Amino acid sequence: DLRILVLFQGWKSFFVDQVEPSRREMAMNLHERLTRQVLPEFLPSQRWFAGKSGRIESVEFDNYDVWVDQTEWVLARVRVWLAERPEPQDYGLPMALAWEDDGEEKLRPLWPYTLARVRVRARMGLLYDAYANEKFTQSMLKMMARNTRIPLGGGWLKFSSTRIFHSLAGDLPEMLPVKRLALDSSN
């Protein structure tokens, strides 16, 4: 059973520094639910999370920005502290939103990648890992192919590709079909 997060100002709802002063307490409460409840429950179930055997003590957003391309996503770097380790682990965690009015056939494949349910007024949807979003992944490929630099937080996120990238991906890598990874693996 997933938690429901109520958004009042889109992505900005999660970040105290992004909302007007009268809404900062609401944003702080929502941010704390995300970092203290939702992310500690979500991260251990992801195949890429290296701290599966540890107990998460805390999670914080180290850097983030709303990225607008064909839609809006949040590009975030989260810092995770585990009880047994003195050094934090950093992870890139892009997030996307999908809405119930988009149809069940669009939402069903996203459930395994979902962090929480979200609500904006009467509209319900999902907050999920953007790597499960085909447009997001295709945008990433396009930026790698073009060696693009985009602003992120107070700095830049630079995409680059090797020579072999173009031989594998072709001239239009953003047109490649996207395959979602299985949730678990054996290494």
List PLM regions with ranges.
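Phosphate/pyrophosphate-binding loops and the adjoining catalytic core of nucleotide-dependent enzymes
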Residues: 2-187
